[in-house]
UniProtKB/Swiss-Prot annotation:
UniProt-recorded name of the protein: Thiazole synthase
Coiled-coil regions, chain positions: none
EC number: 2.8.1.10
Residues the entry annotates as binding 1-deoxy-D-xylulose 5-phosphate: 158, 184-185, 206-207
GO MF terms held by the record: thiazole synthase activity
HAMAP family in the cross-refs: ThiG
Gene Ontology annotations of biological process type: thiamine diphosphate biosynthetic process
List of catalytic residues: 97 (schiff-base intermediate with dxp)
Pathway: Cofactor biosynthesis; thiamine diphosphate biosynthesis
Organism per entry: Flavobacterium psychrophilum (strain ATCC 49511 / DSM 21280 / CIP 103535 / JIP02/86)
Superkingdom of this protein's organism: Bacteria
Length: 256
């Protein structure tokens, strides 16, 4: 399985993880290590940015793990930009998962505010990974604005409904000149495998692992599914046929 790059970092694992909803920080750490993930996202609202004493950070200090702070909770571009600047100063990283969702019920990303924030954050030197609707036009606009990757949703955050936006994801993957990371709604290892078979560069998973009966084992399952899906993509999947085609034709043998 080939590695891939997002700006200045090379990743061997194509499985990125979220850190919310786990029963404990210890459980979270075990799942992350079992997954082989090299990039984990953490909400700024969960960290004491002044002292960095939040226990979650202690469980994420591993050589292979890179932190991706996110702006979850930001309702507009102004709030997201402010949060991004705080994160860069406190965590010493210019990497950012940009999340702007003003509606607390459905957590749908605000496309207009996300584009606005991306334009400003790119000027400030941030490496931006925006969480967005699976909108091919928006993805191209964000690319032009300076985003380092795009993170279109498969279905609503935490829904575990899988790839409900697959038709649009296919277009995004075909057109994108930056890495495509499918985020939100991936509820089973089979969903992750499908995303990789489509040609996505990576997937980000949280809820499906965090609330599983055995998060560590589920993390291992996702790791294997992502690897299998990516290998299938690299091997070039056989095209689907509209009618049956025998793998071992016997016509000539039968009628000799």
């Amino acid at each position: 399985m080939l590695s891939f790059k997002i700006r200045d970092k090379t990743f061997e694992s194509r499985l990125f993880l979220g850190t919310g909803k786990f029963g404990s920080n210890q459980q979270m750490e075990e799942a992350i290590l079992a997954s082989g993930s090299e990039l984990v996202t953490v909400a700024l609202k969960r960290i004491d940015l002044e002292t960095q004493t939040d226990a979650i950070l202690a469980h994420l200090k591993h050589p292979r793990i890179n932190l991706l702070p996110n702006t979850s909770g930001a309702r507009n571009a102004k709030e997201a930009i402010f949060a991004a600047q705080l994160a860069r100063e406190a965590l010493e990283t210019n990497w950012l998962k940009l999340e702007i969702h003003p509606d607390p019920k459905y957590l749908m990303p605000d496309a207009i505010e996300t584009l606005k924030a991306t334009e400003e954050l790119a000027k400030l030197g941030f490496i931006i990974l925006p969480y967005i609707h699976a909108d091919p036009v928006l993805c191209k606009r964000l690319e032009e604005a300076g985003t380092s990757a795009v993170m279109p949703l498969g279905s609503p955050i935490g829904s575990n409904k899988g790839l409900k936006t697959i038709d649009f994801l296919e277009i995004i993957i075909e057109q994108s000149k930056v890495p495509v990371i499918i985020d939100a709604g991936i509820g089973a290892p089979s969903d992750a495998a499908k995303a990789m078979e489509l040609g996505a560069d990576a997937v980000l998973v949280n809820t499906a692992i965090a609330i599983a009966g055995n998060p560590k084992l589920m993390a291992e399952a996702f790791k294997e599914a992502v690897m299998a899906g990516r290998k299938a993509y690299e091997a070039k999947l056989a095209q689907k046929a509209s009618q049956a085609v025998a793998s071992s034709p016997l016509t000539a043998f039968l009628y000799e």
